[in-house]
Regions:
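PRPP-associated nucleotide enzymes
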Residues: 1-181
């Protein structure tokens, strides 16, 4: 798949979810997360860079106190398909005996999220909850990974905006778009 320029992509892309629709999901998810945490302070672990926009807004919708940290692991490296996992930063906060709320932009095939989740468990996390802004609907998910909290479902197309990139661009667009088929 060749990646169009941002201007070309926006001219033909479908707007899947506008800003108010996405933001309404943060409120719902925040309440669900508070209930699941039952007052226990988790490590709020953001997967960079894609989850940055989502994580910041989700954190504001959660009433439970959070300890912030981030990881940087990627499979995409500027492309539209993933390959080998590359670790750029592991958690700095000790995870031993803690609940980890792992926050990412999208659950696609799930290889990155699964690897990060499994690493958190190896580091001693007693429980890892996964929160994603969107889940891509298809049958290629890695075995054993799912979101505990999901904002919206997206079709099996290349999506961008609201933190998700199009060739390292468009992360700050205030809506979720899908490239034209």
């Amino acid at each position: 798949m060749s990646i169009p320029s941002l201007a070309e992509a926006l001219a033909t892309a479908d707007t899947l979810f506008d800003r108010p629709t996405v933001e309404a999901q943060f409120v719902r998810m925040g309440k669900e997360i508070d209930q699941a945490l039952d007052g226990e302070r988790p490590v709020f672990l953001t997967v960079m860079h894609g989850a940055l926009v989502f994580a910041a807004q989700l954190a504001l919708a959660i009433s439970t106190d959070l300890e912030f940290d981030y990881v940087h692991a990627t499979r995409y490296r500027g492309g539209t398909t993933g390959h080998e996992l590359h670790w750029l930063r592991e958690p700095a906060v000790p995870l031993e005996g803690r609940i980890v709320l792992l926050v990412d932009d999208i659950l696609d095939e799930g290889h990155t999220l699964k690897a990060v989740r499994d690493a958190c468990l190896r580091m001693g996390a007693k429980r890892v909850l996964v929160a994603v802004m969107c889940t891509k609907l298809h049958g290629r998910r890695a075995e054993g990974i799912q979101a505990d909290f999901n904002g919206v479902d997206v079709p099996d197309r290349y999506v961008f905006g609201y933190g998700m990139d199009l060739n390292e661009q468009a992360r700050n667009l205030p809506a979720i778009y899908a490239l034209a088929d």
